[in-house]
């Protein structure tokens, strides 16, 4: 990945289009930067909260990495591919996007709300705050918990489970 990251900065410096893997490297760095700018943990790392925290951080990173790239003078041209098939937290990311679509929640709306969460909410509280801000009028807390706990499952399993809700 370091080779791709160096290549990304070289492409930006030379005003050239980045490759898909170079953009993926930039999105990965943005994902990690987002951790540095978040409120992080209130009560120390809670292992059960990690999967959802990483899912939301990755979702936001995939949606917004072109703005990060633009700060260096570059342009994200593979945004659609990375949003859909990025390499970080693949099942969680794909399933979360499926969940949003299933309930008619636009990715732009979700991006804004999750971006706000990254800045004002401790990771420990993501589960409840996500429900309150995005899914409260769509899912009971019981169904929401069951769905969130299945985000890491394979796409087919997740899609089949979602049909039951």
Model-inferred region functions:
Residues 32, 64, 117-121:
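The DNA-recognition helices of helix-turn-helix-type DNA-binding domains
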Residues 46-92:
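Post-HExxH zinc-binding segment in Zn-dependent metallohydrolases
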Residues 23-43, 58, 62:
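Active-site recognition of the HExxH zinc-binding catalytic motif
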Residues 33, 37, 60, 64-65, ...:
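Generic structural signal for hydrophobic core residues of well-folded globular domains
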Residues 2-29, 43-48:
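Short pre-active-site segment immediately N-terminal to the catalytic Zn-binding motif
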